[in-house]
Amino acid sequence: MPKSKTTKLITILGPTASGKTALSLKLAKKFSAEIISADSRAIYKELDIGSAKPTKDVTSYKLQVTSKKRKDYFVNGIPHHLIDVVPPNKTLTLAQYKKLALAQIHVIARRDKVPFLVGGTALYIYSIIDNWLIPEVPPDKKLRAKLEKQPSEKLFKMLIKKDPQAKELVDSKNKRRIIRALEVIAATGKPFSQQRTKGEPLFDTLILGIKKSPEETKKAIAKRTKQMLKAGLIAEVKNLLKKGYSPKSPALSGIHYKEIIDYLNKKTSLSETVTLINKNDEQLVRRQMAWFKKDKRIKWVKNQREAERLASLFIK
């Protein structure tokens, strides 16, 4: 896909619970933008509360139906894309995400709107802004079933043995990502780390980053966990399990869902579950920041005013 000289892309990134949604909404309204989600949990249908998806039930935002055939998210009047893409038991590969996101960016630009890429999933973000050339390897169900039986620690050791550089790309705690990396290696016969070469940049991109201090992050995470539980997180998980979705499905294996499943199976008390969710979110923040800190292109902003100034200069 050729680079567009006129297409400008604003990326707003940051770790979980940093305030990306609030900032992106304010900027999007000011600059007539549409938001493309770069969140590996928001892609799943029926995962609303635990994914921190900006829906009415959790955050008092609006979900409007724009046609009988298609549902679009309108959060405070701002269109959101790549939310509710696949069911909980399906996988969206990075190559598939990139294809969908690029299509949305070009559609938004053709409407003379500014595309915003917003989220904390680094793989999604950098596949777009750095135009990663990703091999389109289809899922291998037999291999996945075999690998799924092994603990994450063992799988990660297998991955690093095959590709030492993969430790810089794959989260050692994310079993789903580890299995995907091993799957790609098995299909291509090449190291996973060598299969994400950068192509020619497709867009003129401004990267804005938002983060909180460790103390603020801890408080924000604890507050959000309480809000999720109050909004019905436990009932949401019960409903998903009742519908027949496996606890090992791609969606339910993530933070907020796996802890609640353990609670429902009486492996932990409610207070232990809350503590574990907060701890896992705090660890996620550290892993996300370890990645983002390496990118010197990110302009870290302290407030909305600073972000507006940078965005205004960029769009001009």
Indicate residue ranges for each PLM-predicted region:
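Phosphate/pyrophosphate-binding catalytic cores of soluble transferases and nucleic-acid-acting enzymes
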Residues: M1-K316
